[in-house]
Amino acid sequence: MTFTSNLPSSSEQSISPPASSFSSSTDTLKDIDIPHNGADLSTYSKFLALYCRSDKCDDFYSLEEKQNCKFGDQWLDFINTIHNLDFSESEVSGRVSERILPASLANKFTNNLGVAIKISEYTRDDERQIRGCVTTVENENSFNNWFVYHILDQSQLSLSEHPIVTKEVKYHELFADFFEKNLKNTIVNDQWNFGGRDYFIERSRYFTDRYLRIECILPAFPCKSSNEQKVYGSVPDKGEELALKRLIKATQDLVKIYPPGMKIWIVSDGHVFSDCIGVDDDVVSTYTTKLHELYKRVAIPGVDAIGFCGLNDLFFSGAASKVFDPKWVSDVEVAHYTGTQICPKSDLSRQILMKGCDTDAGRLRKQIAIEGHPRLHLYRGFSRFMMEDLSLLEHFQSYSRKKFKKIISMIAFNMIKRNDAYSNLVELIFPHHLRISIHAHTNSGPKFGIKVISNEQCSIVSSLEDLDEPKFEDFLHIPTPWHNCVVKVEDEKEKYFLTKSKVVKEALEKGMYDGVWKDTRFDIGEGGHFVIKKIS
């Protein structure tokens, strides 16, 4: 549940905000069934609330609740309670204060979780507001204390202290209509009109109620696939160029109806999965560097439309990163299956990710054993996709089919766990951002699917003999630039198509077309692509 509010101070009569001054979502959160039974939980599993409050009075500016807790409904009672508690300094930073509330007093705020809670608070040098979080007191250790400090420092909360602005125009609704018309990917059984739009609007109001630039996060642009039948090379090409231009255009089109506009943060998941998808860590880093270079060439001067960050950025930035001790995650084993070259820093990030944000606790293993379970469907989808993607990888060429399938199953299992953990991390770092995705979603929230390349820019085809766009309802197989390449067919239409590189190569080999691959020109911002012409 999310609140954004300017509550009356404790000196005022009212103890609850007017309905128009906060927003809340009533969706069933995925984290309400996290067990608190003495198990060694990830730090994410311990988070119950993340908030910002005034340094002058008891007002809260924003509040993100988890695990069905009730801090927002009883905010002044909660604040008065913790004011009466003694505080101490965190072991990892004297700038973080900690208070412990016993389970008997915490239950009314935690919906009777039956555990004591820790309230940690911190103020950044560049802010006046107080940042705070509430975590359960279970299996306390130095890593958990560091992770809390890191989230308090790095979570994107700086806009919370901006005041609510009264506007006659319902910009949140205009933005929802804009998103639906210009970006949203619609699938069968789409839930946008059955609760999804309402959820989207409530998330948008964190920005529109303050009349600030709307910010979205898009986990995407990891690296090129290792499968040479899908892509042509390992650096960004025309596909990435078209995708970046589409996102830039969307941010500028929104300005026409919402002047503060929009910024999209591309949160690369390349180093999350690189060793699972058969790509060396340094290849991911090179792809990312080249993507930034391409963006600089296609960006509109003076317009901050797109920002970039990745796994290493999320962990090795800010004050807390300077006091991190790798020994804290030495017990975390990250399995590698594809024989790729591993970067120590990236692997350390993966260790931190899994220790800090893995919420599996053995549930995935049980879920994929249940016929018809949604997670079993996801697991099988990952397995099919990775079976195809890694089929040509040199590391597996000596494997029997049985052994290959077994490894693929292990890879799919680990990818789901890492994907969940990364999603949890993004949720903590970007608690109020709109979450958009390159995967198909039912659009009920919290994630909303988009097509990074529009049909107007480039048609998606599975064959050059049939240029009609195929239908994609599999949540894993919405076509992306990093699993395909772009081909320009020189005829009277001069049209671009997105397809597998194998399709183009076979058409050239069969003599159906004549053409070449044009390399990416990073100096002028022109992405690489095939240029072909049909032979009469």
Curated annotation (Swiss-Prot):
Cross-referenced Pfam families: DIT1_PvcA
GO terms under cellular component: ascospore-type prospore; cytosol
Keyword Aminoacyl-tRNA synthetase tagged: no
Any single GO BP term: ascospore wall assembly
Keywords of this entry: Sporulation
Cystine crosslinks: none
InterPro entries: Isocyanide_synthase_DIT1 (IPR007817)
GO MF: catalytic activity
Region (Disordered): 1-23
Domain of life: Eukaryota
Reported function: Involved in spore wall maturation. Catalyzes a two step reaction that leads to the LL-dityrosine containing precursor of the spore wall.
Identification of the protein by name: Spore wall maturation protein DIT1
Organism: Saccharomyces cerevisiae (strain ATCC 204508 / S288c)
Phylogenetic classification of the source organism: Eukaryota, Fungi, Dikarya, Ascomycota, Saccharomycotina
Gene from which this protein is expressed: DIT1
